[in-house]
């Protein structure tokens, strides 16, 4: 099952991980999208957007109209959600304008600690 991990890490930590992978020449086995704070992660991944990601999981490239149909929502609302997810780098747009979320599963990782 192709999984993407959404996590919270500082930009510095993300760059250190990138440098480690670059030097080793070995990419991680799973994709990872990092956010700078838990607040930013949850601002991007609202309940409606998570539902949309579920509808897009494993579907391949689809039009926004098809994404709306799969999610059971209106096209205008889904268009706004798609714009936010594209801006955050969570989903991609194909050359022909369709959208794609190429994963079957999403793992969310973050730690809340006392300051």
Stretches with model-predicted labels:
Residues 42-46, 63, 95-115:
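Short, cationic-aromatic polyanion-contact patches
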Residues 67, 78, 82-86:
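Basic amphipathic alpha-helical segments that dock to polyanions
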Residues 54-58:
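Short, locally clustered residues in the helix-turn-helix/winged-helix DNA-binding domain
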Residues 87-96:
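A short, conserved structural fragment
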Residues 64-71:
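A short acidic, leucine-rich amphipathic alpha-helix
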Residues 74-75:
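The DNA-contacting recognition helix of HTH DNA-binding domains
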Residues 1-21:
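General nucleic-acid-binding
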Residues 23-51:
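Short alpha-helical segments that sit at the start of domains
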């Amino acid at each position: 099952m192709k999984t993407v991990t959404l996590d919270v890490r500082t930009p510095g930590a993300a760059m250190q991980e990138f440098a480690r992978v670059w030097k080793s020449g070995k990419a991680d086995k799973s994709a990872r999208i990092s956010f700078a704070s838990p607040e930013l992660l949850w601002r991007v991944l609202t309940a409606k957007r998570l539902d949309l990601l579920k509808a897009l999981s494993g579907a391949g490239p689809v039009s926004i109209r098809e994404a709306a149909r799969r999610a059971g929502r209106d096209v205008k609302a889904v268009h706004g959600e798609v714009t936010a997810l594209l801006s955050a780098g969570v989903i991609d747009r194909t050359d022909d304008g369709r959208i794609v979320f190429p994963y079957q599963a999403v793992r969310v990782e973050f730690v809340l600690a006392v300051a």
